[in-house]
């Protein structure tokens, strides 16, 4: 699986429609301060499902819309933004039977609030479906696929136990353990329901006699 391109529409510093192609051998993005390099990382985190606006360097989701200013009476500015990520999925790393897969996530202003929408290949999707597909592929907004500023120093200051947890996260062990706990919890609930149903069945038989 390889990231082929990113498309922006009024996302943070990217006004209008902007496409960033990521061809074979593409290794870095350079530019002066304030040119939008970090906003590319923010866009990837946004698509991957970051629920923390702090991680996206914004106080509110609406601040991801280009030119948005809280309390501004200006009515001509953008009322929405979106980001699309296209992947080469010829190796079927993503659990979708397509060679090219595009994920789109957007925000729309609705009065003083915002609504968020999700699409896979222009078809309506959900946050849960995004999360499920990305987690199976080992991609997490809060994982270690993306190393942000300060992460290296933070890792060097971790205890042995904290480093082990980090390695388990990268290896997918934590996600597996969470699913295992959820499955066990569901099984216990089902077993409790079966016991209750058996008791009711016995009570019904006694009543019929």
Regions found by a protein language model. Give the residues of each.
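Gly/Lys-enriched N-terminal cap/neck module of very large, oligomeric protein machines
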Residues: 2-209
């Amino acid at each position: 699986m390889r990231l082929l391109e990113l498309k922006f529409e009024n996302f943070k510093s990217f006004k209008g429609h902007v496409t960033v192609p990521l061809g074979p051998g593409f290794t870095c993005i350079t530019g002066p301060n304030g040119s939008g390099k970090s906003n590319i990382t923010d866009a990837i985190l946004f698509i991957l499902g970051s629920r923390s606006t702090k991680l996206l360097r914004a106080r509110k989701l609406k601040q991801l819309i280009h030119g948005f200013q809280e309390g501004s009476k200006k009515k001509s500015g953008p009322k929405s933004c979106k980001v699309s990520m296209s992947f080469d999925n010829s190796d079927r790393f993503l659990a979708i039977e397509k060679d090219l897969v595009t994920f789109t996530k957007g925000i729309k202003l609705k009065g003083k609030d915002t609504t968020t929408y999700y699409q896979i290949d222009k078809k309506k999707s959900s946050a849960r479906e995004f999360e499920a597909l990305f987690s199976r592929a080992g991609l997490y907004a809060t994982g270690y696929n993306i190393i942000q500023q300060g992460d290296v120093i933070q890792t060097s200051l971790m205890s042995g136990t904290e480093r082990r947890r980090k390695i388990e996260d990268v290896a997918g062990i934590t996600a597996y353990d969470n699913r295992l706990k959820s499955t066990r919890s569901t099984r216990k609930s089902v077993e409790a329901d079966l016991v209750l149903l058996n008791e009711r069945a016995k009570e019904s038989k006694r009543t019929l006699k």
